[in-house]
């Protein structure tokens, strides 16, 4: 098939962009031709494309979102393709994947002044047009949670929404081959001998719950925390106030694989996530997780069986209690949870993911 993919930036940035790069690569390997409609594109994505259509960006990110949505809607009817797949704030395509979840639902959790920001209002308006404007045949989401949210917010009929879980490359994301290799990796990464290592990964620390994790960490003095992704500069006053300067280390945009393999727990007290890639990746690496119930990925969690669930992500005391429980497990118990987590996500293969898209395309006809 000749497929058009709509998204305003095909670049290396966050979870959605990473997914799109892998998705495009697997589509190409399956023999499909790709037309990419975008405002920004990196060389790797350009190399995968049979055709690239550029919509010049505006001067601001908000302007780019609005311009891309409007211009792509004009371009779509003239694309000589078999199907158009959208991934952002676009409203005209055959199938649309809401990788970030339901913005209306997330927006309700923001402070009032953030809800009133022009960009937030624009995103809400574009999302409403997507789900109520009639320009899209079928919707794809990555968790059952998001399907329910769309039904509640926009009355999207369930038969128009397919849940296709994100694929996880279990050959790439896998545990260290032996305990000895894992110990050597811990030494290489600077994890002190005998110190429980907690991993937190985020490009939006406020939304992902770092503000809850830091005070909870202060109640569990035996552990140290490594934070990957966004800078910790804005969080240093709180870190210092809590006396955590020597126990919290920022990694920047580090390669997560060695940290998944070396850490003892992945801690993810997010306030909202559709289905975080980091949760699935850490599970594939046999790293047990303490995962927020506000993440759609918890449909893969079995309490005490392959991880543990934080029911109230903003509750410092609950998180501290969960951390103490997690750190109280023996090494053998922790490893058992991790191996069970890996077994849980092994069925999430790319062939299964592409088959889900094919089924969704069939439903849209």
What are these regions (language model features)?
Residues 17-22, 196-219:
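A conserved mid-protein helix/loop that constitutes part of the nucleotide-sugar donor-binding site
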Residues 119-142, 148, 153-154:
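Membrane-proximal helix-turn-helix segments that form the acceptor-binding/catalytic region
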Residues 288-292:
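Short hydrophobic beta-strand element within catalytic cores of glycosyltransferases
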Residues 184, 332-347:
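A short, well-ordered alpha-helix in the C-terminal region of glycosyltransferases
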Residues 253-254, 258-263:
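Short alpha-helical donor nucleotide-sugar binding micro-motif in glycosyltransferases
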Residues 303-304, 308-316, 325-331:
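Conserved acidic donor-binding segment of nucleotide-sugar-dependent glycosyltransferases
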Residues 236-253:
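Nucleotide-activated donor-binding/catalytic signature segment of Leloir-type glycosyltransferases, i.e.
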Residues 271:
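Aromatic "clamp/platform" in nucleotide-sugar-dependent glycosyltransferases that forms part
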